[in-house]
């Protein structure tokens, strides 16, 4: 998918940038288009996030779309199997795979040693930094300004790991969310002072 330009085409469609090419952390050894594995099943249930634009989100017709949706459909077509996609949200998608309800998951999941004990990962197709977002009139300019305030983050993400590691240093509280839509709504309503998410997601919001 990378060698023939399919991956870059999908990412550029949603971000305007060839991030997979620009980022050296994304390997070039992904399976070339047309080099098929032998699927064990003719159909797979794939679980995914529900609100993580531009990777996955509902469009104006309430259809899930985005980088992850385009990519998993392209993989299925290239490898000769069909898919049924569920979008229950990040936490529920993880549970779906663990319970066997879904055979796979496509989402913004950081590869960790702990997760490797439970999941088999593909090679990464996108890497991104985590950044903070605040309201336009916020006076928060640095982590030091977060003291005594509440920061929102999605459960089970690299952003949560970072915030947990540094909360005592900067004195903020953490509120976790199971989906991105609720987290962004909380920022807009003022129930959290800031949120942390992947950079392309915040820039797309």
Residue ranges of predicted features:
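Short Pro/Gly-enriched coil loops immediately N-terminal to beta-strands
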Residues: 119-131, 180
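Flexible hinge/capping segments at coil-to-helix
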Residues: 134-151
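Extracytoplasmic small-molecule ligand-binding "clamshell" domains
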Residues: 4, 13, 39-109, 174-176
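Hydrophobic residues within well-ordered alpha-helices
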Residues: 75, 97-98, 146, 186-188
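Short, well-ordered beta-strand segments
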Residues: 44-49, 133, 150-153, 195
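Short secondary-structure boundary segments
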Residues: 50, 109-110, 136, 155, ...
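A ligand-binding cleft/hinge motif common to bilobed small-molecule-binding domains
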Residues: 92, 108-118, 164-165, 188-205
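Ligand-binding clefts/hinges and TM-proximal coupling segments of bilobed small-molecule sensing domains
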Residues: 2-40, 158-178
